[in-house]
A protein has these predicted regions:
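Positively charged, low-complexity/disordered segments
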Residues: 1-2
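Selective transmembrane helix interface/packing segments
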Residues: 5-258
Length: 258
């Protein structure tokens, strides 16, 4: 028993294992070949289910709103205010996109806080994919509105002609970086938080399974660990909100060329 306990204590798994995409089930389908359901696909489906369930439960015809209805209305008001302040009241047609994006990211982040769960947004395919989609969509929007004049975005107003060959490439690189910055910010923040919880959780488990005195003294760091978990829930909301704020800001830049 002591040998097994020592092996468990020193058998340290990588905190990055939780981000690995693994196949849960697979089958062979004619003309399609090998089709697999991964943990990424499963938790994406679960995320969409939670988003739909939240809105179905919040749909209420009664005069007195339920708690679900109040939470749904407050969430809608928050996202609506975000879009109105960033994009402008005249461009609220982008509200459905930003609203859907916010709730998908929010529930994807929150699902990752469930023990033994998988965080969809820690997958580069999802985070970087959403970032690139937003970038391409915003670029197409700007080109469709301003046509050739859109390229004036890369030359700041009042720039001397002699500096244009130097500033234009810098502005272009800065603009292209948007394709990655959204996804990298989301991916890095979520992966860092979950890695920290994995490391601290494993360390606390080792302390709790040692002597009685040490397990009693571990209660204090365990309380701090609970506070970090609560903070990670807040980070889940903040990262979804920041992603949507920057998306709305990029839409405004494409419309107004600021």
């Amino acid at each position: 028993g002591d040998v097994y306990k020592r092996q468990m204590l020193y058998n340290i798994h990588s905190p990055l294992e939780q981000f690995e995409v693994v196949s849960l089930a697979y089958t062979e389908i004619p003309y399609f070949g090998h089709v697999a359901l991964t943990n990424l696909g499963l938790y994406t489906i679960i995320t969409v289910f939670f988003v739909l369930a939240f809105h179905i439960l919040g749909f209420n015809h009664k005069i007195v709103p339920s708690r679900w209805s109040l939470s749904l209305e407050s969430s809608f008001a928050s996202v609506h205010g975000l879009v109105k302040s960033q994009v402008g009241a005249a461009n609220e047609r982008f509200l459905p996109f930003v609203y859907s994006l916010f709730f998908f990211l929010l529930f994807a982040n929150l699902n990752g806080n469930i023990p033994y769960g998988f965080t969809v947004t820690t997958s580069a395919i999802v985070s970087m994919g959403l970032s690139v989609i937003v970038f391409i969509g915003v670029t197409i929007l700007g080109l469709s509105i301003h046509k050739v004049h859109f390229f004036s975005f890369f030359v700041p107003a009042g720039t001397p002609l002699a500096l244009v060959p130097f500033l234009a490439p810098i502005e272009l690189i800065s603009y292209l970086a948007r394709a990655l910055s959204l996804g990298v910010r989301l991916l890095a923040n979520m992966a860092a938080g979950h890695s920290l919880m994995k490391i601290l959780g494993g360390f606390l488990f080792s302390l709790f399974t040692s002597s009685f005195l040490i397990s009693i003294l571990t209660i204090v760091p365990f309380v701090i660990f609970i506070a970090i978990i609560v903070l990670e829930f807040a980070v889940s909301f903040i990262q979804a909100y920041v992603f949507c704020i920057l998306t709305s800001s990029y839409i405004k830049d494409a419309i107004d060329l600021h």
